[in-house]
């Protein structure tokens, strides 16, 4: 897939009137498209696999603007770039993109906007999607709890991007902890809040703190670092 570079203010053609071979997909990533693990990587893999399953040419039909922070000005610029490339649908994968994507959906009514993790829609060309990630975190908690029983260390660490201000991170913490407690009720989960979706330096520091100061034998994380 190529990186989108051009800008434009023209709306792409109506998605319903575009042939499969001419359909263009845009994606706005919060981290690097070259990541080999993590949240952005998972999204990129899902988008490319879906396109391949539909017989689309990823190299020619997917346009990406990556490393876009949760800043309305930069999100808006990324959308303009992708619309300028002729994209018929644009995926924005970070929660903080929701307001600017709503604005841009009104500006470009013939483009479909799909926002991951958000809650806004306009019932026409702006929708949202998300999986029940807390269920997977419950399973991760089960695995962590079983490992703690195996090692005899009941201290478990968890580095979360945010605390309880977002339903996603709050449910992730709770889901993981409930999984731990289901198999090891004597375990304690120590949570460190990163205050950002991605911060490699502090995530590393928190992991070391959980190991050295809290004697955690198992560590889980909910970040894109």
Language model feature labels by segment:
Residues 2-225:
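A residue-level marker of the well-folded mature domains of exported/periplasmic proteins
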